């Protein structure tokens, strides 16, 4: 797993993976991983549904279909966006962004909660479609759910709405909706196995 964004660090912190040195460093950061922890039980629940959106590859979708008990709604869009330069040229298009522009951030997440109990969103295609040129720092603050730190007005509002949404929302980049979800799924099953071994 590439470490490209704070989401990746939070997931590695929660899962305990990445080696002793990395874990020792992560413990010094005192990261809030509560949003990620709230997502874990959904992967194991046959009645649960999750939404995964963004640059979702077929390998990630197949993994989720095979390794989770929940039902998965996938909105895969703008794969190869950066390599093709569609983000820089303004050609990127996102179904989620079309809807978001029509209903606004607060209603967007309320309606998302009617579809699923969890949302994992790669925000980069959405931002590219909307022409939001947020700094790397702002994108990373958004990934962490720290709306108050974000300077770009739309991204600040969107992130705040995600944090106040009636379902757990994980925001991030491409790795969230690929290797990140795989690690979270593995962590969910590992914790369930440990719970069963303890007999609780």
Where are the language model's segments positioned?
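Conserved alpha/beta core of the MobA/IspD/sugar-nucleotide pyrophosphorylase nucleotidyltransferase superfamily
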Residues: 1-200
């Amino acid at each position: 797993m590439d470490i490209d964004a704070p989401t990746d660090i939070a997931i590695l912190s929660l899962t305990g993976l990445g080696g002793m040195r990395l874990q020792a460093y992560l413990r010094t950061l005192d990261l809030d991983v509560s949003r990620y922890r709230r997502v874990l039980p959904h992967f194991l629940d046959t009645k649960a549904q999750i939404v995964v959106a963004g640059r979702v590859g077929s390998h990630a979708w197949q993994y989720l279909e095979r390794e989770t008990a929940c039902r998965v709604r996938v909105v895969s869009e703008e794969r190869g966006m950066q390599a093709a330069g569609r983000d820089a040229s303004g050609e990127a298009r996102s179904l989620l962004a079309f809807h978001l522009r029509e209903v606004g951030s607060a209603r967007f997440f309320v309606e998302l909660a009617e579809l699923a109990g969890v949302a994992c969103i790669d925000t980069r295609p959405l931002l590219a479609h909307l022409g939001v040129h947020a700094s790397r720092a702002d994108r990373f603050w958004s990934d962490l759910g720290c709306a108050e730190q974000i300077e770009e007005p739309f991204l600040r509002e969107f992130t705040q709405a995600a944090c106040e949404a009636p379902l757990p929302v994980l925001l991030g980049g491409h790795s969230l909706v690929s290797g990140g979800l795989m690690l979270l799924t593995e962590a969910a099953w590992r914790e369930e196995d440990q719970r069963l071994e303890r007999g609780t």
